[in-house]
């Protein structure tokens, strides 16, 4: 989850005119929005490590290690000591995109362990390719190009094939007798990430749940009526796309009302994205009911598609007028008839008058009233600057991310249920003796696994919750999935354990501490820009793919091109398909990548446009050829675990660029003819 734009202006201005500095390093240069880099030649030895930005000193919060993401905190009296084991050129990379800075330290090796064999981009004259396959397929073997379905017989170690006209010059080569998809492997997963609300409306009857309604303007931050039934209706489409895991936005009950959207408060912002959870025991009514969820999960499993829930344990949602009125917490500066006169019969119907913005509703709220706000979550549950609650801290674990209430997941004090739940008659939450906030959250989340057979979680804001909490969630969810599979042997896809991937801003292809605390994969934030550099020449992915294939023999990542928190990747048109789907490790398609879903209305929050409605009219229209291209490559990927899990050997070809991926008995050869 990226910080809500309406609060970005209140956070430290890391990306403004001031620059980062560190003793012994030249001034940092900005490498894309929010990331800063500096290089220096340093001798072996021990030295203090501090960084400075706009007269603020920062230092690593933990032990200093190479190639690991280090959280930064304000400097203490004693700077940490950095031990350099050899002379070399060291790189400091600071990432501020999550609101708190992180640091990555690396050293340039004298000789990179993997060197690309590609010196210049190959050219193609459009004629058939003669490919030496002698090291991959035996003499006399029938080899099929999966894309065009052409078959050639290996003769003198070679085959000749013409890439299909729509393939962008690709040959996807496999043994011709390969006729079914291989057993599923998370290292080769193709995950489709969808904001359910923006995908497909399968049940119009739930469109205005909790009194939510349209704003009559651009509908930037409103619910757009997508739901679980809509997802079920599109499962055949996803199956044809080669998808074998569906990551859906958190379906749990969200705050009912809105907050001001964007830096200018120019639209109402509802929790359509699922990141402002209010009750982890209920489905949000806009998403549907429990029968809808069961149908979705069962129908997906019948098609070989796993279901992942997006989950949040770091924070709750903001206080909204709708929830204050419904659950009787908080306080207003208004009294008596002033309330109805200013806010109306139903407070959530308030709209800004002349000279006001959607932020102006805050002017009516008395955030200092201790008694009123004690009726909200309660001090045992959250820290916030509201009322008499404990103030947020300044570190990753206790900060109030975008001023969202921070859940005390580190607390060892029994908390009871959230205070306002006593006025929430529809909650399924039951008090459990001795339970802390963390205990409740892991119990509630794992119960969805136990009841429905959810296959995994994508964890939001992982770095803002202590690692033992994630291990506890993984342990409980794993036990829950085992129980569900034992009770539902006819519905279980296989015996694979519960899978968990996480978001930690700036994380790349490295085996960090997250992997030792329950995570099976982490989102690879580096891949988007690496792929952007190879849009015009696929061969330029060679070094990246070789390094990933080598490193990922021991762990896994989830790579993406587009996301709701960064941007839509639309460079190169349908060439994005091969850039993503041929990557080692698990990959994530963001809904509409395959159909070039357009950037939507965005107001003063530049991220809102990445969450536009799925462009179904284009899937069978102007984007049909692009969708077909994605389908071909994704289906090929699903047939061959070697693509995601295999080791890579780059080939020296007379024509084009090619590589072999091999995993166990599975072996494929991919050729790109070159630029035309």
Please place each PLM-identified region on the residue numbering.
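Bacterial N-terminal signal peptides
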Residues: 4-13
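Short, polar loop/linker segments at the starts of domains and inter-domain junctions
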Residues: 29-31, 151-163, 203-228, 574-577
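Active-site-proximal helices and loops of the catalytic beta/alpha 8
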Residues: 116-169, 176, 315, 331, ...
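Loop/turn elements at helix/coil->beta-strand transitions in domains of secreted/extracellular proteins
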Residues: 187-192, 239-246, 301-308, 452-457, ...
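Acidic glycine-/aspartate-rich tracts in secreted/extracellular proteins
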Residues: 54-59, 198-199, 640-641, 675
């Amino acid at each position: 989850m990226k910080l809500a734009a309406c609060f970005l202006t209140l956070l430290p201005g890391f990306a403004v005119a001031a620059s980062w500095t560190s003793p012994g390093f030249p001034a940092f240069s900005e490498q894309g929005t929010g990331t800063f880099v500096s290089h220096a030649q340093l001798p072996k030895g021990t030295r203090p490590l501090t960084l400075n930005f706009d007269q603020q000193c920062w230092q690593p919060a933990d032990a200093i290690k190479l190639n690991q993401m280090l959280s930064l905190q304000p400097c203490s009296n004693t700077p940490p000591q950095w031990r350099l084991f050899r002379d070399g050129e060291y790189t400091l990379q600071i990432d501020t995109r999550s609101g708190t800075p992180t640091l990555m330290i690396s050293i340039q090796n004298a000789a990179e362990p993997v060197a690309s064999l590609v010196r210049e981009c190959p050219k193609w004259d459009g004629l058939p390719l003669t490919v030496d396959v002698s090291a991959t397929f035996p003499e006399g073997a029938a080899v099929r190009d999966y894309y065009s379905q052409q078959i050639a017989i290996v003769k003198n170690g070679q085959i000749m094939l013409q890439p299909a006209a729509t393939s962008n010059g690709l040959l996807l080569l496999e043994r011709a007798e390969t006729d079914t998809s291989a057993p599923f492997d998370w290292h080769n997963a193709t995950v489709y990430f969808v904001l359910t609300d923006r995908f497909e409306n399968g049940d119009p009857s739930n469109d205005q749940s909790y009194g939510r309604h349209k704003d009559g303007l651009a509908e930037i931050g409103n619910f757009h009526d997508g739901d679980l039934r809509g997802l079920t209706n599109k499962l055949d489409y996803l199956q044809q796309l080669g998808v074998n895991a569906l990551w859906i936005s958190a379906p749990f009950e969200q705050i009912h009302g809105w907050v001001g959207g964007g830096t200018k408060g120019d639209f109402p912002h509802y929790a359509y994205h699922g990141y402002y959870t209010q009750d982890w025991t209920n489905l949000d009514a806009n998403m549907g009911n429990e029968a809808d969820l069961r149908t979705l999960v069962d129908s997906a499993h019948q098609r070989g598609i796993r279901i992942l829930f997006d989950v949040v344990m770091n924070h709750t949602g903001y206080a909204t007028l709708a929830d204050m009125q419904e659950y009787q917490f908080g306080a207003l500066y208004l009294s008596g008839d002033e309330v109805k006169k200013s806010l109306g019969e139903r407070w959530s119907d308030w709209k800004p008058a002349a000279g006001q913005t959607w932020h102006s509703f805050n002017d009516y709220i008395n955030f200092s009233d201790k008694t009123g706000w004690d009726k909200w979550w309660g001090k045992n549950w959250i820290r916030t600057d509201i009322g008499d609650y404990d103030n947020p801290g300044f570190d990753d674990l206790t900060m109030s991310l975008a001023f969202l209430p921070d859940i005390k997941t580190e607390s060892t004090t029994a908390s009871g249920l959230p205070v306002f739940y006593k006025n929430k008659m529809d909650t399924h939450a039951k008090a459990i003796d001795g339970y802390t906030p963390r205990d409740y959250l892991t119990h509630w989340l794992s119960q969805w696994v136990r009841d429905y057979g959810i296959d995994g979680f994508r964890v939001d804001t992982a770095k803002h919750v202590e690692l033992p909490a994630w291990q506890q969630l993984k342990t409980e969810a794993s036990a829950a999935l085992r129980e569900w599979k034992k009770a539902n042997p006819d519905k279980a896809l296989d015996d694979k354990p519960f899978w968990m991937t996480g978001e930690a801003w700036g994380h790349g292809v490295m085996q960090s501490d997250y992997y030792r605390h329950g995570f099976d994969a982490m989102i690879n934030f580096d891949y988007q820009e690496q792929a952007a550099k190879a849009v015009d020449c696929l061969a330029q992915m060679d070094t990246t793919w070789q390094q990933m294939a080598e490193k990922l023999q021991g762990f896994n990542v989830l790579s993406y091109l587009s996301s709701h928190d960064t941007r839509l990747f639309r460079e190169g048109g349908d060439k994005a398909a091969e850039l993503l789907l041929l990557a080692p490790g698990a990959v994530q398609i963001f809904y509409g990548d395959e159909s070039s879903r357009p950037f939507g209305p965005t107001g003063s929050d530049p991220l809102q446009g990445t969450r536009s409605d799925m462009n179904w009219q284009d899937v069978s229209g102007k984007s049909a050829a692009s969708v077909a291209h994605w389908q071909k490559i994704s289906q090929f990927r699903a047939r061959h675990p070697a693509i995601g899990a295999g080791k890579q050997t780059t080939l020296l070809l007379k024509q084009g660029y090619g590589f072999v991926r091999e995993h166990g008995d599975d072996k494929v050869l991919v050729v790109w003819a070159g630029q035309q």
